[in-house]
C-alpha cells in the first residue's frame, strides 16, 4: 500500500480501509464507513476551509516533517478554540503539550478528545481504544472522522491529504469542458 500511496494511485477510501482492516467491531466499522463516504462526498479530509487554513498555518510554523507531527497538527487544527491554545505552545520542533494541559481542560468535549488523540501521536500512550470511538454520545461524528483520518496522515504524511483532496478524473474533465464552453 505504501508504494501506491507514494504514487498517488489509490483512493483515500482504500487507505482508510487498509489502515483499519484489523478492526472487526461492527459499530466501529459502521461509523468508519460513514466517515469514508463523507470524505468521498467532500473530496477532503478537512472538516472545513477553516480547518484546512489552520493546518496549513501550523505546517508553516514547524520545521519537522515527521508524520506523527503532521497528524498532531491535523488533529489540533480541527477545532478553532483548541487551535488558539495550540498556537501559544507551538514551537519549531513540535507542540509543548504540558504547557497547554490546563487551558484544554476548560474547552468543550470535542476539543478535549482531539487533544487526547493528538497527544497519543506524541507520546504513543493509548488512553482509549477504538471501542471508545464507537460511543456516539461521547465522541461526535466529526471528531470520530478527524481521529480516523489522522491515522493515514500519521502513517503516510501529507501524501494521504493530497490523495484525499484529489478530484476524480471524470470531474476534472467535466470542469475543463465547462470552462471551454464558456470561452
Where would I find each of the regions flagged by the language model?
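Non-Sec secretion/translocation targeting segments of pathogen effectors
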Residues: 178-183
Amino acid at each position: 500500500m505504501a508504494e501506491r500511496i507514494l504514487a498517488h494511485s489509490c483512493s483515500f477510501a482504500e487507505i482508510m480501509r487498509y489502515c483499519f482492516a484489523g478492526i472487526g467491531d461492527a459499530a466501529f466499522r459502521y461509523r468508519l464507513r460513514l466517515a469514508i463516504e463523507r470524505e468521498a462526498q467532500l473530496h477532503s479530509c478537512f472538516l472545513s476551509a477553516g480547518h484546512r487554513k489552520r493546518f496549513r498555518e501550523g505546517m508553516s510554523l514547524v520545521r519537522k516533517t515527521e508524520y506523527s507531527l503532521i497528524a498532531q497538527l491535523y488533529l489540533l487544527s480541527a477545532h478553532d478554540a483548541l487551535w488558539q491554545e495550540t498556537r501559544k505552545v507551538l514551537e519549531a520542533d513540535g507542540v509543548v503539550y504540558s504547557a497547554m494541559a490546563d487551558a484544554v481542560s476548560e474547552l468543550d468535549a470535542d476539543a478535549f478528545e482531539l487533544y487526547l488523540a493528538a497527544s497519543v501521536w506524541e507520546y504513543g500512550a493509548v488512553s482509549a481504544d477504538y471501542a471508545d470511538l464507537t460511543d456516539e454520545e461521547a465522541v461526535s461524528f466529526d471528531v470520530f472522522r478527524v481521529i480516523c483520518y489522522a491515522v493515514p496522515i500519521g502513517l503516510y504524511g501529507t501524501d494521504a491529504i493530497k490523495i484525499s483532496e484529489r478530484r476524480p478524473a471524470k470531474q476534472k474533465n467535466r470542469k475543463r469542458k465547462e470552462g471551454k464552453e464558456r470561452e
